[in-house]
Regions:
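Class I SAM-dependent methyltransferase Rossmann-like catalytic core
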Residues: 17-80
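Class I SAM-dependent methyltransferase SAM/SAH-binding core
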Residues: 58-146
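Short alpha-helix
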Residues: 66, 205-231, 243
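Short conserved loop adjoining the S-adenosyl-L-methionine
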Residues: 142-150, 166, 177
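A short SAM/SAH-binding and catalytic strip from SAM-dependent methyltransferases
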Residues: 154-169
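A short glycine-rich, Lys/Arg-flanked "PGG" loop and its adjoining helix->strand segment in the class I
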Residues: 169-184
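Conserved class I S-adenosyl-L-methionine
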Residues: 184-216
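Core SAM-dependent methyltransferase catalytic element
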Residues: 222-223, 231-253
């Protein structure tokens, strides 16, 4: 079975619910997507697109609350000695639980002004606590190599930005490298995006397919447990949907 035939079969046979998309998947031997699947309508440099800061949220308040609640359930307890977290594709807000702190929380994004304003990267007067301890400005589509040592992080998060990665396997292999054995990677997404900058395989498919696409990144990157999908949509049909695909680095990787 060729790659396009496999994709057509799997997309038509999985449940209509994203949470079921990664159950009992028979992955082909080779990564089933082609280079053109990762092209975008707008191929101008991403640095230009993200040059001006956008101090807006990209999902609604209910979806944000659902994501924050999920984080509160799966993150290591606040102030756990030695814990490090990386928020990839970060901006001016990370949606971590209020007051959440760790010894090292790194934000990586495209716009420095947004990262500087992140309440996890700035000590606001009197009422807000430091959350981000450092930030890195990097275009993962140009430079997927992550500037961190092996086995550095306990958790990696990515909020509604996995759909912009044009070299996802390179990035996910790097995620595996920098995660500690047993470390958790959480990719969250909705049906909202900058359409012109999202990859074509994303804009031409639906939520269930998206769970399968992200799951394939974990699978073909290697070194991860079988990925799982979770639907945390707070008010189906009334607010933004919210989905999680997550996996842990194998303890032997």
């Amino acid at each position: 079975m060729n790659r396009s035939a496999w994709w057509s079969l799997i997309a038509s046979s999985v449940s209509c619910f994203p949470v079921h998309a990664l159950q009992n998947v028979e992955w082909p031997e080779q990564f089933p997507f082609k280079d053109e699947d990762f092209q975008r309508f707008d191929e101008t440099p991403d640095s230009l697109f993200y040059e001006a800061p956008r101090f807006v949220t990209h999902i609604d308040d209910a979806a944000i609350a659902a994501l924050t609640k999920y984080y509160s359930e799966v993150f290591p307890p606040s102030n756990t000695p030695g814990v490090s977290i990386l928020d990839m594709c970060s901006s001016w807000v990370s949606h971590f639980p209020k007051g959440y702190k760790q010894e090292r929380v790194v934000g990586m994004g495209m716009n420095e002004e947004e990262l500087k304003r992140n309440p996890v990267s700035t000590i606001f007067l009197l009422t807000f606590l430091l959350v981000l301890t450092e930030y890195v400005v990097q275009d993962l589509n140009l430079k997927p190599k992550l500037p961190f040592e092996d086995n550095s992080f306990d958790v990696i998060t990515n909020v509604v930005s996995v759909d912009y990665l044009t070299k996802p396997l390179d990035v996910f292999k790097e995620m595996c490298r920098i995660l500690k054995p047993g470390g958790l990677a959480i990719m969250s997404f909705s049906n909202r995006c900058f359409w012109t900058k999202a990859i074509s395989i994303w804009t031409s498919t639906g939520d269930t397919d998206h769970a399968l696409i992200v799951g394939s990144y974990f699978h073909y990157a290697g070194g991860f447990e079988p990925p799982q999908a979770v639907d945390i949509s707070p008010n189906p049909g009334r607010s933004d949907p919210m989905y999680i695909v997550f996996s842990r680095k194998l303890s032997t990787a």
